[in-house]
């Protein structure tokens, strides 16, 4: 009798010591993928790749689109946890408010991966992204290599997104020396909460008024805001005359690069990012520790991280990057252009 009671007690203690969300070695894994806003082409691509990798590994996955709402994203997280998700991958809408998602997951012993946007002041299990400071450096240094003097306008992402601040940091690091030498002047800076085309347009209209149309370059944080900037420039017949950067290698941005109205974009190969995120999610759900490359501070905690390197892309690099990787096919780009534009572009490159 005593032996039986002791055995039961040992078993109970073992159950208590195992985190609630952790699965056995071969147990099925249910991944919850919480996305800020699936209206953006960038997140649509991530979602498809993450789903595909999860299926390859035999994991169940549920994707939730918050549509840019913090409250909805928290509701969706709680629903996924109630439905038995044993690991969450989160693209946070607000880096601070998403801490509530981590707290909810902790209560159920479920690990959380911050995907491409670091959740602030929270003990997330892993942060996986591209080096956002390097993104900003690539954007600004590329424009500065062409427009070595003149007025610069910084068009940033969301003030609630840690990545946006890192991108801004990289931009300013790249521009600092030229600014200190009075070669360039940063005439204004605007933040776009939704990283949207409309916000980019509105902010650029104001910058053009403030500078009386005298801009050398617009360091736009992503391709959506860049699209708005180019639209505002076009209305003043300045598209192609004022340099514009971007990020994400969205198809409309590739079209603008070919047409010469956007100088460059920063390409982030999403396949490796999605693969490593899902692989790490499955490992964490099974109680294992994924391999990492870096450590970052969330403000309150030091977080293990996987940081991949971004790539600057302009007209001369399209074939060797986004096309050769299959991110966009030549046929897809050709269809997005007007008749004859692709042929003219490719013949010019020969």
Region locations from a protein language model:
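N-terminal secretory signal peptides that target proteins for export/translocation
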Residues: 1-3
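Bacterial N-terminal signal peptides
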Residues: 7-19
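A residue-level marker of the well-folded mature domains of exported/periplasmic proteins
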Residues: 23-350
């Amino acid at each position: 009798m005593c032996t039986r009671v002791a055995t039961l007690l040992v078993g109970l203690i073992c159950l208590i010591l195992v985190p609630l969300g952790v699965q056995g070695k071969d147990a099925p894994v249910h991944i919850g993928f919480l996305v800020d806003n699936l209206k953006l082409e960038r997140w649509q691509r991530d979602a498809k790749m993450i789903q595909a990798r999860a299926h390859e590994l035999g994991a169940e996955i549920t994707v939730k689109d918050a549509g840019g709402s913090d409250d909805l994203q928290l509701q969706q997280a709680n629903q996924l946890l109630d439905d038995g998700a044993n690991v969450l991958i989160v693209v946070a809408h607000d880096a601070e408010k998403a801490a509530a998602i981590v707290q909810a997951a902790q209560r159920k012993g479920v690990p959380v991966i911050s995907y491409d946007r670091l959740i602030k002041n929270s003990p997330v299990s892993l942060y996986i992204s591209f080096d956002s400071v390097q993104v900003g450096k690539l954007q600004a240094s590329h424009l500065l290599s062409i427009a070595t003097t003149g007025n610069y306008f910084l068009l940033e992402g969301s003030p609630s997104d840690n990545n946006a601040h890192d991108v801004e940091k990289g931009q300013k690091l790249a521009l600092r020396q030229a600014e200190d030498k009075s070669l360039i002047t940063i005439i204004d800076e605007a933040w776009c909460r939704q990283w949207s085309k409309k916000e980019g347009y509105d902010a650029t209209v104001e910058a053009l008024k403030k500078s009386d149309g005298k801009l050398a370059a617009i360091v736009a944080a992503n391709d959506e805001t860049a699209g708005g900037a180019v639209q505002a420039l076009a209305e003043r017949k300045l598209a192609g005359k004022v340099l514009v950067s971007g990020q994400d290698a969205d198809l409309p941005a590739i079209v603008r690069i070919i047409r010469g109205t956007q100088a460059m974009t920063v390409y982030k190969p999403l396949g490796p990012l999605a693969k490593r995120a899902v692989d790490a999610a499955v490992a964490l759900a099974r109680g294992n520790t994924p391999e990492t490359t870096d450590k970052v501070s969330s403000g309150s905690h030091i977080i293990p991280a996987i940081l991949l390197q971004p790539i600057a892309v302009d007209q001369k690099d399209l074939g060797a990057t986004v096309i050769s990787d299959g991110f966009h096919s030549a046929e897809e780009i050709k269809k997005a252009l007007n008749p004859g534009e692709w042929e003219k572009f490719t013949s010019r490159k020969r």
